[in-house]
Amino acid sequence: MHFYTMNSLLLIRPYSSSTSNTIKKSAKSIRNEFLNYFKKDLGHTFIRSSPVTPLNDQTIAFVNAGMNQFKGIFLDYYDPPTTKVVNSQKCIRISGKHNDLNIVGNDTYHHTFFEMLGNWSFGDYFKKEACCYAWDLLTKHYGIKEDCLYVTYFGGNEELGLKPDLECKDIWLSIGVSKDKVLPFGMQDNFWEMGISGPCGPCTEIHVDHTKQIANQSMRINKGYTDLTELWNIVFIQYERLTDSTIVPLSKQYVDTGMGFERLVSLLQEKKSNYDTDIFQPLFKAIQKFAKTPEYKGQFHNDESKLDSGYRILADHSRMITVALADGMIPEESNKLRKIIRKAIDIGENTFKKQGILLELSYAVADSLGDVYPELQTNLKKVQKIIEFEEDSFKRLQNTCGKDWKKMVEIRPDLVAVTDWMSFGLLNGYKYLQHTLKDLKDTKVLSGDVAFNLHDSYGLSAETIRELANIESLHFDEKAFQDKLQNLRYRSKIGLEKSSETLAKKIIELLEKNQIPKTDDTFKYEYVFNGNNCQFPTIASTIVGLIVNGNLILNRENEITNEKTVSNIQKKIVDSNTKSDQEDEIGIILDKTLCYSMEGGQTSDNGIICIKDLIFNIINVRKINDYVIHFGKFAQSDSKYSNEKLKVGDSCVVSINPEVRIGIMQHHTGAHLLNASLKQIMQAVYSRNSHISSHVLKLQFNSFKEKLTFEQLKKIENNINSVIQADVPVTTKIVNSLELLSEDFITLIPGEIYPYTGIRIVEIYSNNLKSKEACCGTHVPNTGLLKHFCLLNYFSKGSANLNIKAAVGSFAMSAKLEGENVQRKILNLEQKLKTEKLAYDIFKTISQEIKNDITNDDRKTPIPYLIKEECLTKLNDLNKNAWVQAKEIEKSTLSMDIKGITNSTNIFIVHCLYQNPMYLSLHEIVSFYTNIPTLIMLYHNGTVRARCYVPQEIASEMFNAQVWMKVLLDIFNTDYGPIKGFNPLLIASMATTSISDTLQESLIHKAIEQAKAFASIHTRKM
């Protein structure tokens, strides 16, 4: 099978950098010449490169060929937009038979990122034209000598009944290629297949002899020589492989070609290595300038310092990383991408002894590729923000997990083979694996269950699990692991509990086995908008299946009735361990419905199903493999007993709760506006998950350590409310996968796999905010229906995990009114504080009551987050003001008290307070008097303490704070108190000391008199 992989090449002679720096044609001109040849000369339509993120194929980690974005056409999901196409596709390959990551940088041509030049025909031209175009471009426009070119064609396969492609052979001969240079090869080299089944066909390859030898080199084709390589692969998609492996002709025929851009540039610039071209040389110069290391010399086999290989790896990886991040890939969602980022960081720090080199190189990559891929320039700040975050995370891991892992490797040296040893959960994951080894040794298999636990609980990737399995001599059951991983994603998408997974799987198997038709739920988007309100229809439907306590009923023989009689009939079909009839869970499967099932973070509708005179209350709705199951209970019948019975095949009428649906629509549209506003304000952000209900929206997102300020949150709220006031339309359109790729500035979920058809895009365009998302949820027709938007909460979990809770509509309006009510209370409190000189203890009581009300999480109606924060800040400010006001009042009172025992002739103050100040400290009281020596004692509840102050201009050896306080220490038989940070000659204190009630009066009187006497003696001398 041939999958557009360049043949493995055998290095037969050492390559070194070309000594000539002359560039005959620039890489840019070579690319443009290819595109213009097909666009201008041959009337092809240019379709830009898709992102390197595979949006429609979960079997690949990255887009790895030009044909990926056209698979929907080949699989006949939709018609092509035009019959002739040309493009240059960004591709990434980091694994596979010929793409070992460890080879990159150690040979002349392997890369993680490369460009694939290609042209396509969707039912226009076929073999003859495709071959002629390729030959003409290579020989006449690029000037490659015909003598250096060889072609291969499909030689047939008798087992599959496939004849040699003699038509292709004859075309090459008619073009003028000599017979000895037209060579047949088998399935492996010259037959292309998309997968195990699907479109396929023979291919023809053009090979080039880099040595330009006159002697015929036919015998060396496809033998792995580096000087005789495949240049262009032309695939003729004319067959289809069926699931039984037979191959039959297709009704439509396609041409699909691919040529490696870097290899073509190396050939035309006459370089022996791709790294010697002007694709990589600017990156080498950027590295050398930033790291201040010796220049790149192009050494391969004599590179003892590993500097040149470091140049090559870093240049290659920086291209791959910058392109992948600019295209919306997130390291958190792609272990392979994170692995390469960390490898590049490691080389930058260890080989070039420089931090931040990867971020610096992103500028050079954007300069190099930005003209043909403008998203690199547009998204450069986002790219650099993510690189900064990854560098910081990697550094923290090295300082923590890295040390512990190295200790583990010392105990078990085989663990050195684990490449991603910086994985956060690796250490604990390996300990878990060791614990389970005794159970695994018997089977010699690392089961899907154990592997899934390693991934789900410890975050280990499939690659790391595979490496650990090899170390422990276990076979890794990767298929079982991938199945469990897929089930997890599916459960998460549809909101299915883990405990329901097995049950759901059995039910779906039975439904499909009995060929029960899937539910048509396209009606969920239908409503009539009359300018003010949305009106939802009811639809007539038919019951195709019933689920009672997990048991599926598909035929008319079994029947159930309403709650009063259902248990009697269920005894026939339900075991004795089922719940009582009051708790019976019933699911109704219909052939069509207008109910939205829980999906994409949006909660399901609720409503009713009317069957005859029975009313079934829909509590929640789930969609599993396109079967929509309505879970709920029957309403109590008005009569004591109902003779009506429910059967498969019964007709019914379905309606939804309009208030719930409108609330959900409002909040989902609000979530889109919030997401758009976050992207507008933050450098890099992506939504991790969301929850949309009828009364609230919750968004969890990664901001790569960037936190939102209060002002930014205010701007977000104002921006969204301005869009609501503008009453702009919310439009939707349906596109296919190829059309999706052509959409500019669209928000997609990282790691999400989108279908080939029926992709719904929701757009909101206003003057100051634009939102465009691929979304299957329900939305309002215009933003005015949201009425108001307010944030309810904002908090972070960890360095990058931010959470926002918000509301729109009547819920937001109610929250706003609650907030305004609290604001009025605070304003009244402020007025009282100003006009009534409110006592601090009274103020504190009122203030605390308001604060408790604001922070009460059990409030029936929440207060908007911004109002809450403003109110709490205002209360804190008022508290400070009230405290200052109380202190001033107390200061005035104490000053009057002290003033009463002093007069203008006093040259010192000695006084005792008998009431503990509420707001002033003893130090603050002493500080009232900064120009004269002051000693204040405080007696309260059987204890006495004191503090004194002596001005610096008065302090001396005979009279200073310490010697003055010593008078009191001797009387109370105690020690000095703490005066941390003060000069002991100027400030002194006495430790709090207990004295008896009988002695307090005499001791305090004695202390006052002796302190006065001491001060009088020494101040008189001054």
Give names to the regions the model predicted.
Residues M1-I12:
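N-terminal chloroplast transit peptides
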Residues I12-M1022:
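A glycine- and charged-residue-rich anion-binding loop/surface
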